[in-house]
Amino acid sequence: MQRTQHVKRTLSQRFALAALPLAVAATLAPLPAQAATNWVPTRTTAFLLSNAPAAAASTASQAQPAYSLNSVGTPALADTHVTPLELSQPLHVTVVLKHRNTDQLDAFLHDVNQPGSASYHKYLTPAQFKARFAPTDAQVAAVVAHLKANGFSNISVSANNTLVSADGNAGNAQNGFQASIKRFNYRGKPVFANDSAALIPASLGSIVDSVLGLQNAAVPHRLLHRFAPAAAIEPNRISKNATAASQQVGHQPTDFAKIYDASGLPAATNTTVGIITWGDMTQTIADLNTFTQNAGLATVNTAVVAGGSGTLADDGDPGEWDLDSQDIIGTSGGVKQLIFYSAVNGDSSDSGLTDATLTDAYNKAVTDNKATVINVSLGLDETAANSDGSLAADDAVFKQAVAQGQVFSVSAGDAGVYQWSTSPQGAPGYIGTYNGTSVRTTINLSKYSVSSPASSPYVVAVGGTTLSTTGTTTWAGETVWNEGVAYADLDSNGNPVDNAVRIWATGGGVSAFEAAPSWQTAALGSTVTKRVVPDVAFDAAQSTGAYIVINGQTNQLVGGTSLASPIFVGGWARVESANNNSLGLPTSAFYQNFPTNTSLLHDVTSGNNGYSSHGYTAKAGWDDDTGFGSLDFAKVSASSAK
């Protein structure tokens, strides 16, 4: 669930009233002249788009030009004042460097998971990957020198040489990347974004791929769904697709191992699992300890690893990380170690959370190479991720994970086919307004999008179902998760703050940017040229979700694809433990084996993930709602051992 952040307005003492004229003058300074250096583009394009021709303002009172964001539909910014970001405003940037020998890397990634190949399941160590495919030390040194020359400090280089992070300010970014940055209010909080592309000197053109950290207007949001009775408007009438004796009820996290036939496998005590998070994990670990004590499970060996330098602040909302950790442990029966790879968020309002800090966290999980399976219950519109460069940057991280035999599992999203559309307070899946009697749609219902990083070909994308059981632990049926329409923007008590409405449904569909991997085209047909998601799906409905501990309070019923991915991670950790942590990214095997071995699956054939006859409709076999469906983990494990 995306929640509104209540941002504290704090001003540094250096912006005291006496210094205000100087600060204003600094923000209006022109971009440095480019004559001395030949500048070339990176993948990081302008995130803030002007809808008016560039023209010098003749008076201070001249109206501001209209702006839009560089995401699907280029949503216009309304009722907000767009001004230059003060040049002294601190920024944390991450420069993403290009891999070397990319053709060889792509060939290796194909072969390492291809039975019969000489490289089959012969994974690389981080040192081996660095030697063969990472940027050279000389290339890194050139980037570091450029950052230093433009005033950046606290420069750090990732262990795999692919990320160079640094602290500076908007003025340093303007000098170093020719990047103009604006500030404005969006989704109820003050944010910033670049309104020009990030450029680099031509001498770095073959080295640098993108520059992250130039915007914090669009970052991945949490994908959990908590019950709010006042929010319901048009709930879908869901067919149980099961026997008359079945029911749709909430579950303890330990129930899912039985429901999906993982409980017969040994607990995943030979496997280390990671979770991508942000901020402080103190409350999350306390809640996890309460859960394991109540469930009769062993206390979990946990660790918190910061994705980069900076503050891991408590933002007061541990629900997402509680859902992830408790359902992974409940489904897995226990793990060797649970590592929280936490992105720097800066403060209690998450104002320091950017595309840069999240990519840093993904990369830290890969360079550590300790976690076999890594959960990501986060997502955002993939057009936004492509615009700022993080889509390609994250793909590069996930490629190294595949080469090392690590598995990233990513939630497919909770906004159905409308990941791109957001409410006034930033909730995805926005479709229109409610006047008390009927819904008035205000978007193009035929425009679809998918969530990043779930759309990456180098991860397992996990969609959502509505689960029916006999009792609470015997699988009886699943349909596509689609709860219909609800109020989008809620206060802390779960009451609507405006008349905006959204859908709650599993993400799924066709990527606009990611090419279909060969194994997907081979299984689904030559017409599939772009990556389609999800690959598999598990329980996500709030009504059939998990009872977890949040802020010390037990029996909090939560759903979303943030539940579905941890169920897969917990079950897959058992499969990995039973197979010596040797299976690697399983998607190519899924697409090779599942079409002809349906006994390994629970096929989902009913429901859709849109609104008012839009979206994708489930069918026999693979579909854009639930992929191949949910797994019978014991049968998949036995098949994997052959």
Regions found by a protein language model. Give the residues of each.
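Gram-negative bacterial Sec-dependent N-terminal signal peptides
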Residues: 1-36
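Glycine-centered structural positions embedded in regular secondary structure
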Residues: 12, 509-510, 570
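Short hydrophobic/aromatic segments of transmembrane alpha-helices and their interfaces
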Residues: 16-17, 155-156, 400, 613-614
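N-terminal low-complexity, intrinsically disordered patches enriched in charged
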Residues: 28, 422, 472, 569, ...
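Substrate-binding/charge-relay-adjacent region of secreted/lumenal peptidase catalytic domains
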Residues: 38-159, 165, 170-461, 492-496, ...
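Active-site-proximal C-terminal subdomain of hydrolase catalytic domains
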Residues: 458, 463-494, 500-501, 505-507, ...
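An often Trp-containing, charged/polar helix-loop segment at the C-terminal end
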Residues: 466, 470, 521-523, 569, ...
